[in-house]
Curated annotation (Swiss-Prot):
Protein name from the UniProt record: AP-1 accessory protein LAA1
Other remarks in the entry: Present with 300 molecules/cell in log phase SD medium.
Pfam families membership: Laa1_Sip1_HTR5 (PF20210)
Provenance organism: Saccharomyces cerevisiae (strain ATCC 204508 / S288c) (Baker's yeast)
Entry-linked InterPro entries: ARM-type_fold (IPR016024), Laa1/Sip1/HEATR5 (IPR040108), Laa1/Sip1/HEATR5-like_HEAT (IPR046837)
Knocked-out gene: effects: Deletion, when combined with a conditional mutation in clathrin heavy chain or deletion of GGA genes, accentuates growth defects and increases disruption of clathrin-dependent alpha-factor maturation and transport of carboxypeptidase Y to the vacuole. Causes mislocalization of AP-1, especially in cells at high density (postdiauxic shift), but doesn't affect GGA protein distribution. Sensitive to diltiazem-HCl and hypersensitive to chlorpromazine.
Subcellular location: Golgi apparatus; Cytoplasmic vesicle, Clathrin-coated vesicle
Quaternary structure annotation from Swiss-Prot or TrEMBL: Interacts with the clathrin-associated adapter complex AP-1. Interacts directly with LAA2.
Keywords: Cytoplasmic vesicle, Golgi apparatus, Protein transport, Transport
Any Gene Ontology biological process: retrograde transport, endosome to Golgi
SUPFAM superfamilies with a match to the protein in the record: ARM repeat
GO CC term, one of those recorded: endocytic vesicle
Length: 2014
């Protein structure tokens, strides 16, 4: 279709929308993917462009264009048109202007139907006729296209086409005027596009200061006035987008020089008034859509005034914002102000990258703090002022990523008034710094809270990296403690929260701070003077908060017990005291107890709880007699604190039924007392409300145990709490009074700005209330979801309500938009104890609790939802009737009715979801009552209520249906669905239809297994085509709900849906575009295009790989939908489109979508979100570019989701599409957003998928780690600089940064810091560097698996150590640990590598100093015990790795020696370097780390045979061994002491002699005990006396048995954990391999259990484990033999030995199943057995174990064992794998043959004879030569004598031939030597040698090879020597034999061997001269004698020895 004429396509089309969009999509894909444009491609682009022009001409003259009203298609067409111009403009420079001029003519309704060169007379005739046609200035598709494209052309080429502006202005205003004249001309989209064109011209012309001439301004001003007047009088509605663009257009006017000149004297006041009072002021911020455009416009105007024109200072700019903010009446303006502020900050940051440097952001914050003016503080509620603080918090969240660490640190120091290097000593600076400093004055407390909030953010972000100086840390700590104990309560509680974060970053000061506060409390409690409550409250609150979450490494158990004793002893004596000082002290003690309930130790809680329950019973169950209001109030406050303590306890313990019963009793009594109180006052009411709320919160903890038996009176109370229509009807009311039926009381509220306004009755109206209570609406309701409270322990259903639209949080400004609809502020000071009892937040969205009335409503609803599902049906029915009375009461206000309806529906909805999750049933009558109640609720146009009602209908039908059988269930569902289908058909009201269609969808959703999909589908499908926007959008949403639960969809339905989705997407009668204002506005919030995208996405998931089976037209429709949504400039659509692509990519369907396009779009979203701002382009700029500084509204959420997509593409191995282009961008994201899990995952996958083929990964990471931010952002800043220049914003003083095309910033040859001079030299923030460090560690650990990568990394050892040093020097635990892990990696992997320049030395020897330097910072002040423990481990690795002798590693070895000294005084602290350890737990952690380190060094010194290291460690064995033994004993005592849950600490001083929970100690021993066992095993094996010095024999045996048991227990507990088993099994081997007898192991029960464990390990483990098991089983066999040394004892428990041998046999049989006695296998079966090299090694080891053990067994036992083993060997000889396996069993075979032949028992010989008989056929005919020779040699050389003469002859031939074969010659030669040595031991061998020698003679005569003959000669000589040595009588014969062979030898090889023969003869003569003479003279033949003589004569001559006689004389031994 791409090559077809577009005009012809449309002329012949039956579906214009589909065919036009398909043509556009096809060509868009083509143009976007063009890389280098050659001539042919240029012509193709030109052709596309021409066809587009032709198409526009064609439709401009069409009469009927109704089916071409396709604005969404025209957006895609505009993209194609603009891209084609970009591709052509270099080749055809005039194409930009010509195209714009042509489109201008179309818009101006000029005749464009015929080109000048067209000669067609018919066309000329048409032209003539049309030239007289009157211009209508109304909408037409051609003009819509022209206008749309012109907007984009001006955004891209504005300066090139500015001459067309007058024509366009004229056309724009004439068209707008005409359109607005009559409703029939009205076209919402076209008039918006016209105004967008006007604004695009204003923004992008090259003469912006004069562009808005007076005449044009007058037209525009008039238009604006007309529009706003019409809105004001409700005369006419306009598209909100149109109004937004109208407001944008005003920006150009305010930026013009004339305007500025005219208002130069009052420019600030003018801007202020225009944005608060005039047209913009009234309408700009009020609407959710226009607000963001108004915010952008204000920011751009002020940016122009400040940055471009310098007419305002920055301080004046902020003052304008403050003034607007303070003088507004609604939250809309407040949010808009901060949205504008952030946009302005980022515009300035782009223009000046130093805009936020140093403390400039703090200046901004303090300038904006003017919103806390004295008037505001005095006249606004706490609710409002708290919201002001949240605006600042949101601003910090957005801006903080762009601040570097030094700027953050500087601002923190300024706020806290630190006397650091940042502070100057000059007077001017001191005065300046004073303005930053924080104080605690009542009149400035809100400013102080603002500073505290910022401090919290900074400290949380900086972690511990800023705490480098001890003085500074103490200064900050003291300042925070001062603030935390000041007079102002709000400041106190906020400061404590900061102090907690600060001290968790500097935990070494935790204990000291708590001690100081406890000391202060103790002093004041004892003092008789005035008790200063605020100061002591601060100290108590500090202690309580610091205990929560603190590590026991820093807070000792002893300190916890002191605090416990302090608080409980006071309460015990003053439980209910209300006298002044005792009351206050009691409250503080309860606060301490609340904090103590958070101490992380279950055993501690168990110890304290009896006493606490006593307190609670005394306080809560007894009726208190009071005399006045003050006494009652104080008692209620004490009760409240006691209840909070109970709540905190329940949050930290395991609740059981008995405990729930106890607590429930307490609560009932407490509640009864509250209801008995008649005294009425504001204070008492408030205290009672807090009490009731706390009671409900405690009930929430018990809900699991009380839900089926809930207190009915309490149930009535909680229902009234959230549904009583008589509550909250006015500004405020006394809830407690109403609960007691005592009437309502009103309280005025200055923030209630809307009390006199007639408001729409909807949730939206409630959410926009300013009165702080929103008519009793729950804070759980947010408008689009129902949130759960964090304190509820019940089921959490965090799924959005059915029918919810995608979240708006893709837009960065959504955090401010949420504030617009958040009427109730969470405030810490209203319930400061939440810091202690809370789990980190009040709810899923709020950190703190709201006011107590709202919190009571929330708790009541949460408790109701948890209890209602489990009540019986009668109670449920009764409750629903009560709720109906409340919901439909006429005696209340409309807004209160809405609030009640929302609360009830939300509570019911959560209850029904719990029923759904737990598969609970609901009685039919109850269910029907609820359904009818829901239907009766009015407020039909309220979206939230409609959605939740519809979802409840679905949940209700499911709950009722569960009571029915399958058949009845289907019938019931059919009935219900038909009711709603009938309602849809009968009712025309759109909102009612919306409710019914959503109800239909939810019925299917929750009953999909039983409902008929087609029935629901058909109805909803028909409704989708309803043109009413409400019905259309919600029907689509209902279809989406339907499809999400229909998991299998047929292709026909999928095709129908996709075709329909395309149709609904492109046609202007549906969706966001078109004539109707109502439809356009409604679709701003409920965009049907978004729903279409969701449906399409769901189809990609459901249809999956079957997508490929759809026909071409449907696939075209799908492609059209995805690409249209991708380029729609709507982030939701773009993300949905990209997720559709993600699904397609996951299924690897590459032919459906163009991957490159979607990845470009993904990258564009990521890039546009680096800087936060509001987009200024009306079109997606991914493929066209833009001249705007911020063209697209940034979306960090969208960016992170696109990182997730790219991560997935790595997993799918599609990185070639994006990896190179994303490299620089991803590094920048890592620099800015290190907290993002998506970014971290991206880098992890990137490395994991590329590190094998990219050897430069370490270089990249190392480079980025050391890179400055300036260098990192250099090319990005260069691009921004170019944009600034285009927009005329680049100041003359700026110098352009020169650079080449952007290349990888991680290039090894990157710029140095000096190269990047003038740029920001600040390093990446510490979090980014921590991630890089972690990535380096990951790279190292992954490289360990690949030898080549490990070798490649060896070239980077110096850099690895350097990066380790960089990490270990940062004051952050994570970075220190990672640095040490990298160092450990280097030591473990490279210590054995030799230095190529000094081969004898380790490659690490030269790095010794650097290694030490990287290690020692771990012992600097502030290092955690965890860091120091691991550093000690690394120090041990340095020593053990043998990079240098210990004496040359002075600092390291001395460190370990010094650490041993700490064991001398158990009561003192430990000092390591600058670090001091004081708490017992931390101290023990270090001590165990020291012992663990020494254990490692000792083991390695023994196993590595390192003499120097052994000598070094040996000196300390006498110290270490007792310490290891003691530690292991301690471990076992802690672990197995069942008498109590606590252990007495043996060596503590009396002062510290307090019981310490077992759990706090046992965790210390778990990681190290195994290493102690291994070390003791090694030392035991090396020198048993060292251990015997500490333990006697009996103790040692018992101790070793305990160690053995521990190892077995660890194995059993971790039977499925390979890593644990690989640690434990070597330790077990070390324990067993000692030479000691451990008798206990072989007791019946124990050995049985041991065998069972071994069996399981063999059956489930891998080969590595089995290798170790062979050693262990062998150890046990040896141990059995030692423990049963006598024959009697040996045989007594022989079955145990059998079991151990069976285990070995099991290992063999698993690999050789054919050896099993009862298994019959054929050779074919054998072939199926796969034996790996690992199996071969394991078999070899197992057979060796057999061989090494059998000799030690009793003879009686051996027979059975021999039989078994011979059977196995025989099976092996017969199997098909014999050639591989036989070499393994030969040593065992040899041992067996030797043992059997040497046995005196004839049975053994027979046994061997039978064996030989069974395998001799295999030996002689089937074995290969090597195994054959080896087998024969084993039989012969070990004395097997049952061979026949024929077999002996055959053996002689085989072995003789083996000598001739190079492959078998070594084996044969060695075998012959052994045979010769045994010829007199085994007589048969003499005969055998006779045969062999005979064969030798034959071989010589047949010209054997010289080398073989030489070997045989030597064997004959050896034979003769052995004969002479053993039997002298045969000496002459044996010498004669040799001489005969020499003669034959000489005859065969003549002169070649004369010297060799002569040497042999001389050697024979030496053996026995007389026998030699006798042989010469009388035995050998004359011929042989002659030969010998001639050889010797020749030898004598050659050696010049004289005569032969002389030669023999010389050589003789005489």
């Amino acid at each position: 279709m791409a090559n077809r004429s577009l005009k012809k396509v449309i002329e012949t089309s039956s579906n214009n929308g589909h065919d036009l969009l398909t043509w556009i999509t096809t060509n868009l894909e083509k143009l976007i993917c063009l890389k280098e444009v050659n001539d042919n491609e240029i012509q193709e682009v030109k052709e596309i462009h021409t066809q587009l022009d032709e198409f526009v001409r064609y439709i401009s003259v069409l009469e009927n264009t109704d089916d071409l009203e396709l604005h969404s298609v025209f957006i895609s067409l505009s993209q194609l048109y603009t891209i084609s111009i970009w591709r052509l403009k270099d080749e055809y420079p005039g194409v930009v202007f010509d195209s714009a001029a042509f489109l201008t003519n179309v818009l101006c309704e000029e005749d464009v139907s015929i080109d000048d060169g067209d000669t067609d007379p018919n066309q000329k005739k048409k032209k003539k006729k049309s030239s007289t046609k009157k211009k209508k200035y109304i909408y037409s598709p051609a003009k819509d296209i022209a206008c749309t494209i012109l907007v984009q052309l001006f955004e891209n080429f504005g300066s090139s086409i500015s001459s067309l502006i007058p024509l366009l202005f004229n056309a724009i205003f004439k068209n707008l005027k005409k359109i607005m004249e009559k409703s029939k001309y009205y076209h919402a989209t076209f008039m918006t596009t016209l105004l967008q064109l006007f604004n695009a011209i204003l923004r992008n012309s090259n003469n912006d200061d004069k562009i808005l001439d007076p005449a044009t301004y007058a037209k525009f001003s008039k238009l604006s006035k007309t529009v706003f007047d019409s809105i004001s009088t409700d005369e006419k509605d306009f598209s909100v987008t149109f109004v937004s663009v109208l407001i944008e257009c005003w920006t150009a006017h305010f930026k013009q020089t004339n305007f500025i000149r005219e208002h130069s004297h009052d420019i600030i006041e003018t801007i202020y008034s225009r944005f608060t009072e005039g047209e913009i002021g009234v309408y700009g911020f009020a609407n959710d859509e226009t607000r963001i455009f108004t915010a952008k416009s204000l920011a751009e105007i002020l940016f122009d005034y400040y940055f471009s024109k310098n007419i305002l200072t920055l301080q004046e700019v902020w003052s304008i914002y403050v003034k607007i903010f303070l003088n507004c009446d609604t939250r809309d303006v407040e949010s808009g102000c901060f949205e504008s502020i952030i946009h302005l900050i980022n515009l300035n940051l782009l223009a000046d990258n130093t805009f936020l440097s140093n403390s400039k952001y703090l200046d901004i914050v303090l300038s904006l703090s003017g919103v806390f003016s004295s008037y505001e503080v005095n006249n606004r509620s706490m609710n409002t002022l708290s919201r002001y603080l949240r605006y600042f918090q949101h601003m910090h969240e957005v801006i903080l990523p762009h601040l570097n660490d030094s700027a953050k640190t500087q601002m923190l120091y300024y706020i806290l008034g630190c006397s650091d290097t940042y502070q100057s000593s000059s007077k001017s600076d001191s005065a300046s710094n004073f303005k930053y400093s924080i104080d605690a004055k009542p009149e400035t407390q809100w400013l102080t809270l603002l500073q505290l909030d910022f401090t919290y953010v900074l400290i949380s972000d900086l972690g511990s990296t800023f705490t480098t100086e001890e003085n500074t840390v103490k200064e900050i700590r003291d300042k925070l403690v001062d603030l935390a104990t000041c007079e102002i309560f709000t400041i106190r509680v906020h400061t404590v929260e900061i102090l907690k974060v600060f001290l968790n970053n500097c935990p070494e000061y935790l204990s000291e701070t708590i001690e100081n506060s406890l000391r202060a409390l103790s002093t004041d409690f004892k003092s008789t003077g005035k008790f200063i409550f605020h100061k002591n409250h601060g100290h108590a609150f500090i202690i309580a908060n610091l205990i929560k979450g603190a590590e026991s490494d820093y807070i000792s158990y002893e300190l916890i017990m002191r605090i416990t004793v302090f608080s409980t002893s006071f309460i015990k004596n003053n439980t209910t005291s209300t006298s002044s000082n005792l009351y206050f002290k009691g409250l503080l003690c309860w606060i301490l107890l609340i904090g103590l309930m958070n101490y992380k130790d279950e055993q501690y809680l168990k110890l304290q709880i009896p006493q606490l329950f006593l307190f609670w019973k005394v306080l809560l169950t007894h009726t208190y007699t009071y005399h006045d209001e003050d006494e009652l109030y104080k008692n209620l406050e004490i009760r409240n604190h006691a209840l909070t303590c109970l709540l905190t306890y329940l949050s930290n313990t395991t609740i059981d039924k008995e405990m729930a019963k106890q607590v429930s009793y307490l609560l009932t009594k407490c509640s009864n007392f509250n209801h008995s109180i008649d005294l009425k006052s504001k204070n008492i009411d408030n205290a009672l409300l807090h009490n009731e709320n706390r009671i409900l919160q405690v009930y929430l903890k018990l809900e699991k145990y009380i839900n089926s038996d809930f207190n009915s009176s309490l149930l009535i109370l909680i229902v009234k709490n959230f549904s009583d229509p008589n509550l909250y009807t006015e500004s405020s009311s006394s809830v407690l009074g109403s609960l007691k039926d005592i009437g309502n009381r009103k309280v005025s509220n200055k923030d209630d700005m809307e009390s006199n306004i007639v408001l729409e009755s909807s949730i939206n109206t409630l959410l926009r209330q300013n009165n702080g209570f929103a008519f009793g609406l729950s804070s759980k309701i947010t408008g689009d979801r129902i949130v759960n409270l964090s304190m509820s322990s019940a089921y959490k259903y965090d799924e959005s309500i059915s029918g919810s639209w995608p979240s708006k949080d893709y837009n960065w400004y959504n955090i401010f938009e949420v504030e617009v609809s958040k009427p109730i502020s969470p405030i810490l000071s209203l319930d400061s104890l939440i810091l202690l009892y809370g789990s980190g937040s009040y709810s899923q969205i709020d950190r703190y609790a709201p006011q107590v009335t709202t919190s009571l409503i929330d708790s009541s609803m949460e408790l109701f939802s948890s209890v209602f599902p489990f009540l019986n049906s009668k109670i449920q029915y009764s409750i629903m009737e009560t709720l109906n009375l409340s919901m439909f009461s006429k005696m209340t206000t409309p807004l209160r009715s809405v609030a009640v309806a929302a609360n009830v529906c939300s509570a019911l909805h959560n209850a029904l979801r719990i029923m759904q999750e737990n598969n609970l049933e609901l009685d039919y009558s109850v269910g029907q009552l609820i359904i009818e109640s829901i239907k009766k609720i009015q407020f039909f146009n309220d979206i939230f209520l409609t959605k939740i009602k519809a979802d409840c209908v679905g949940l209700l039908t499911a709950a009722i249906a569960r009571t029915l059988g399958d058949e009845e269930r289907q019938k019931f569902l059919t009935e219900q669905s038909r009711i709603f289908i009938k309602n849809v058909a009968d009712m025309d009201e759109p909102y009612l239809r919306m409710f019914h269609v959503l109800s239909l969808a939810t019925i299917f959703k929750y009953n999909s297994q039983y409902a008929n999909f087609e029935e629901y589908f058909d109805v909803i499908f028909a409704l989708m085509r309803d043109p009413h926007p409400v019905v259309h959008s919600w029907s689509l949403k209902a279809m989406h709900i339907l499809l999400e639960k229909h998991l299998v969809i047929d292709l026909k339905t999928a095709a129908l849906l996709l075709s329909s989705m395309e149709e609904l997407l492109v046609q202007d009668k549906y969706g966001i575009y078109g004539r109707s204002t109502l439809r356009c506005n409604y679709n701003r919030d409920f965009n049907s295009h978004v729903a279409i995208g969701e449906i399409s996405r769901t189809l990609t998931e459901t249809v999956g790989p079957n997508f490929l089976e759809l026909n071409t037209k449907v696939l075209d429709s799908f492609r059209n939908i995805t690409l249209s949504m991708l380029i729609s400039n709507n982030i939701l659509n773009s993300i949905t489109s990209i997720k559709m692509f993600e699904n397609i990519a996951t299924f690897k369907m590459k032919n459906i979508l163009n991957y490159e396009i979607f990845i470009l779009a993904s990258k564009s979203i990521i890039k546009s979100s680096i800087v936060t701002g509001i987009g200024s382009s009306y079109f997606d700029t991914t493929f066209t570019g833009s001249n705007e500084l911020i063209s697209r509204t940034s979306s960090l959420k969208g960016a992170f989701e696109n990182f997730d997509l790219l991560t997935l593409l790595y997993k799918l191995q599609m990185e070639e599409f994006f990896m190179k282009e994303m490299e620089n961008l991803s590094w920048r994201y890592l620099a800015l957003f290190p907290n993002s899990g998506s970014v971290k995952n991206y880098f992890t996958e990137w490395i994991l998928h590329t590190f094998k083929r990219d050897n430069h990964w370490f270089d990249k990471l190392y480079s980025i780690f050391n890179m400055s931010l300036g260098r990192l952002f250099q090319s990005y800043n260069r691009d921004v600089s170019a944009l600034l220049e285009v927009n005329g914003l680049k100041k003359s003083s700026e110098k352009e940064i020169k650079g080449e095309e952007e290349e990888s910033i991680a290039n090894v040859n990157q710029l140095t810091d000096t190269d990047a001079g003038g740029l920001d030299s600040e390093n990446l923030q510490w979090k980014s560097r921590q991630i890089i460090l972690n990535l380096i560690l990951m790279l190292c650990l992954e490289s360990e698996k690949y030898e080549n990568l490990l070798l490649a990394l060896s070239n980077k050892i110096a850099d690895l150590i350097k990066i380790s040093f960089r990490g270990s020097t940062v004051r952050n635990e994570g970075m220190k640990l990672t640095g040490l892990h990298i160092l450990n990696f280097v030591l473990k992997n490279y210590s054995t590598m030799r230095d190529p320049q000094v081969p004898g030395s380790s490659i690490l020897e030269q790095q010794e100093a650097q290694i030490t330097s990287a290690l020692m910072p771990a012992f600097s002040k502030g290092s955690s015990p965890t860091v120091m423990s691991f550093a000690i481990t690394v120090a041990a690795e340095v020593l053990a790795s043998n990079i240098m002798p210990p004496d040359k590693l002075g600092r390291i070895s001395q460190l370990l020696i010094d650490l041993l000294g700490n064991f001398k005084d158990p009561n003192s602290g430990i000092r390591i370097g600058e670090a001091i350890i004081v708490t017992p737990k931390a101290k023990r952690k270090i001590e165990l780390a020291v012992l663990d380190a020494w254990a490692e060094v000792v083991q390695r010194s023994i196993t590595s045979s390192n003499d120097a290291l052994f000598s070094f460690t040996r000196k300390y064995w006498s110290i270490l061994v007792p310490l290891w033994i003691i530690s292991l004993r301690e471990y076992m005592m802690i672990k197995y002491n069942d008498n109590d849950s606590t252990v007495q600490v043996k060596n503590d001083s009396k002062e510290n002699s307090l019981i310490e929970p077992r759990s706090t100690k046992i965790e210390l021993y778990e990681p190290v005990w195994l290493n102690f066992v291994e070390a003791l095993g090694c030392t035991l094996d090396s020198d048993v006396q060292v251990i015997l010095a500490s333990l006697n024999d009996e103790e040692l045996e018992y101790f070793l048995f305990i160690l053995f048991s521990q190892c077995l227990e660890a194995i059993v507990k971790n039977i499925d954990d390979h890593s644990v088993k690989m640690q434990v099994l070597p330790a077990l081997h070390n324990v067993l391999k000692s030479n000691l007898c451990i008798k206990s192991i072989f007791e019946d029960d124990i050995i049985t259990e041991v065998v069972e464990i071994m069996d399981r390990l063999i059956s489930t483990g891998d080969s590595k484990e089995e290798f170790l098991l062979v050693d262990i089983i062998s150890d046990l066999i040896i141990g059995y033999s030692k423990c049963n040394a006598t024959p009697e004892t040996f045989l007594q428990d022989i079955d145990k030995l059998y079991e151990l041998l069976r285990l070995l046999m099991t290992i063999i049989s698993e690999r050789l199943p054919f050896i099993k006695y009862n298994v019959l296998t054929s050779e074919e079966d054998d072939n199926e057995i796969k034996i790996s090299p690992t199996d071969i090694s394991l078999l070899k080891k197992t057979f060796i174990a057999f061989e090494s053990n059998i000799s030690n067994f009793d003879n009686m036992f051996k027979v059975d064992l021999y039989s078994c083993l011979l059977f196995i060997i025989g099976k092996i000889y017969e199997c098909s794998h014999r050639e591989v396996i036989i070499p393994i069993i030969l040593p065992l075979f040899k041992a067996l043959v030797k043992a059997l032949t040497e046995s005196e028992d004839e049975k053994n010989i027979v046994l061997l004879e039978i064996f030989y008989g069974s395998i001799k056929d295999v030996i002689y005919h089937k074995l290969d030569s090597k195994n054959k020779v080896a087998t024969i040699l084993i039989l012969l050389s070990n004395g097997y004598s049952k061979l026949s003469f024929q077999e002996l002859n055959q053996c002689a031939n085989i072995l003789s031939e083996a000598l001739n074969n190079p492959a078998t010659q070594p084996i044969a030669l060695q075998g012959f030597k052994r045979i010769i040595s045994n010829i007199f031991k085994y007589p048969l061998l003499q005969y055998f040698m006779k045969l062999v020698i005979k064969r030798f003679f034959q071989d010589i005569q047949t010209n054997d090879s010289l080398s073989q003959a030489s070997i045989k000669t030597k064997l004959i000589i050896q034979f003769s020597e052995e004969v002479i040595k053993q039997d002298h009588q045969k000496a002459s014969l044996s010498i004669a034999l040799c001489l005969s062979f020499f003669a034959a030898y000489h005859s065969a090889y003549t002169e070649k061997i004369d010297n060799e023969v002569a040497s042999g003869i001389v050697a024979l003569a030496k053996l026995d001269k007389n026998s030699f003479k006798e042989a010469i003279s009388s035995t050998i033949s004359p011929q042989q004698k002659a030969i010998i003589g001639s050889v010797m004569e020749a030898y004598v001559k050659s050696q010049s020895l004289g005569s032969v006689e002389e030669a023999f004389q010389l050589k003789s031994f005489d």
